[in-house]
Amino acid sequence: MAGKTLYDKLWDDHLVKQRDDGSALIYIDRQLLHEVTSPQAFEGLRLAGRKPWRIDANIATPDHNVPTTDRDKGIDGIVDPVSRTQVETLDKNCDEFGILEFKIKDQRQGIVHVIGPEQGATLPGMSIVCGDSHTSTHGAFGCLAHGIGTSEVEHVLATQCLVQKKMKNMLVKVNGKLGAGVTGKDVVLAIIGKIGTAGGTGYAIEFGGEAIRGLSMEGRMTICNMSIEAGARVGMVAVDDTTIEYVKGRPFSPKGETWDKAVEYWRTLHSDDDAVFDKVVELDGSAIQPQVSWGTSPEMVVGVEGAVPDPAKEEDPIKREGIVRALKYMGLQPNQKITDIKLDRVFIGSCTNSRIEDLREAAAVVKGRKVAASLKQAMVVPGSGLVKAQAEQEGLDKVFIEAGLEWRDPGCSMCLAMNADKLGQGEHCASTSNRNFEGRQGFGGRTHLVSPAMAAAAAVTGHFVDVRELMN
């Protein structure tokens, strides 16, 4: 019998019942909740007279709607009435149903996909869901993690189970070592550039190879975070010493003998040598440059040394039309050099790149430099109150402020136009977030996806520049 993939092992460990129609009931170990996709789920419980099946399996925090300034005012500092109501409703629901919530004034508050791992609420081998498509982030820990819809949030609250269909197995192997200045963000953008935004549809992607093994947990989280942008609901990395070291000693992590038993199990969470994948994609990590997205889809990406494509050279009429439309929306010209793209704003943050390593990388680039006078704004938004505190302990906040960047409070911020942080029409933004479709960061806003180091380099020059030139 052929060996099992990591995904096969995780699926089998959580399988409650296989059904005749091909669907299956799987057990969920952890559910993360935020203010946008949970209100109707709680209301459904209320109307049915139900209570959460396992209260301690759920953790909540507000993130999408919270302001990143004036946080001392708490909920009263939320100007938009809809945003304020959503945060108030989360507080009310968690209080009523006894669910642990890191509220707006709690230092542990932050973006849901940042706080899970930093609290040790995300542990290897778990099945993890959240009403948010970027739940794939947690797969970096050898977890079966994916986003779900609001009705499914209610289902998990009520039963701790979920009806799913098993996906196919895909291995994305990044061979060789990454060059200086090349990060996990560049790797995942290069992967999406190669396989496209539908390349992973129907698959659970395991990321492997020397380049992936060499990444920190922060780098691996960035890659798994953007699995969904490659079309895959699930992305994962096998457990190794890096994983175990990161999890050790965190508030929700096991202790004592339980820890030893857990580690013994966690070390089995890798694909067997003879496991068979339905699809295998390989990349040369040493050939990956710092990446910049130029269009309105994450697959519209190119190395910083490259140029915007020329639609006249595209033979596929559908792709050609897509390039023409993207160029028009983005206000770019065919064959325009990436380094000639001028910027209006820079955003360093989001569930993709707002962890301490991301902030250290950005700070190293801006240290001793100043934000370009041509920029309207450059902002840094830490992913949680604890990330913010650690950054301030290391003096990173002073580095950013002295360079002219705004140092904000934690939240989803400018990743999406759901709070006060937005782009104006026609503005170009170097953003460390994960999506660049039309209007994502604000009506008419033009998003360029980059790493924190590349965003920092753009902040001090006013246009895209190869960050490796600033590192020498």
From Swiss-Prot:
[4Fe-4S] cluster binds at residues 351, 412, 415. Its EC number is 4.2.1.33. It catalyses: (2R,3S)-3-isopropylmalate = (2S)-2-isopropylmalate. Keywords: 4Fe-4S, Amino-acid biosynthesis, Branched-chain amino acid biosynthesis, Iron, Iron-sulfur, Leucine biosynthesis, Lyase, Metal-binding. GO terms for molecular function: 3-isopropylmalate dehydratase activity; 4 iron, 4 sulfur cluster binding; metal ion binding. Its cofactor is [4Fe-4S] cluster. InterPro entries: 3-IsopropMal_deHydase_lsu, Acnase/IPM_dHydase_lsu_aba_1/3, Acoase/IPM_deHydtase_lsu_aba, Aconitase_4Fe-4S_BS, Aconitase_4Fe-4S_dom, IPM_dehydratase_rel_enz, IPMI_cat. Pfam families: Aconitase. GO terms for biological process: L-leucine biosynthetic process. Binds 1 [4Fe-4S] cluster per subunit. Pathway: Amino-acid biosynthesis; L-leucine biosynthesis; L-leucine from 3-methyl-2-oxobutanoate: step 2/4. HAMAP family: LeuC_type1. NCBIfam families: leuC, PRK05478.1, PRK12466.1. Heterodimer of LeuC and LeuD. PANTHER family: 3-ISOPROPYLMALATE DEHYDRATASE (PTHR43822:SF9), HOMOACONITASE, MITOCHONDRIAL-RELATED (PTHR43822). Catalyzes the isomerization between 2-isopropylmalate and 3-isopropylmalate, via the formation of 2-isopropylmaleate. Belongs to the aconitase/IPM isomerase family. LeuC type 1 subfamily. This is 3-isopropylmalate dehydratase large subunit. The lineage of its organism: Bacteria, Pseudomonadati, Pseudomonadota, Gammaproteobacteria, Pseudomonadales. The gene is leuC.
